[in-house]
From Swiss-Prot:
This is UPF0342 protein SAOUHSC_01977. Pfam families: Com_YlbF. It comes from the Bacteria. The lineage of its organism: Bacteria, Bacillati, Bacillota, Bacilli, Bacillales. Belongs to the UPF0342 family.
Length: 114
């Protein structure tokens, strides 16, 4: 009987949705969206990040003033309790993803370990 990895991936997706880490992100993001100032800061910072990524992908240099603006945004975000809670929740979920990834690639690691 052949194993369908996609069935397992779909089960993993459902398990992630039921996890405490996912629920924490969902709640934290709802709190960010519910607070006008938090939402504005969050959206501005995301836009800055996207612009930086696009410039890096195109090989463009990021201007000093853009870096300064990003640093100021990052400082404002650190002071925002809603966004800080969201970032903490995201870090916890990222740790879960890293651990899951280690489990997933273990068979390949074993092949190349010899």
């Amino acid at each position: 009987m052949a194993v369908n990895l996609y069935d397992y991936a779909n089960q993993l997706e459902q398990a992630l949705r039921e996890s405490e880490e996912y629920k924490a992100i969902k709640e934290a993001f709802a709190n960010v969206k519910a607070n006008e100032e938090s939402k504005k800061l969050f959206d501005e910072f995301r836009e800055t990040q996207i612009n930086f990524q696009q410039k890096q992908m195109q090989g463009e240099e990021i201007a000093e003033e853009d870096l300064q603006k990003a640093q100021e945004q990052a400082q404002a975000i650190e002071k925002d309790e809603n966004i800080s809670a969201l970032m903490n929740a995201e870090q916890k979920m990222s740790q879960v993803f890293q651990e899951i990834n280690q489990i997933i690639v273990k068979p390949l690691d074993e092949i190349y370990a010899d």
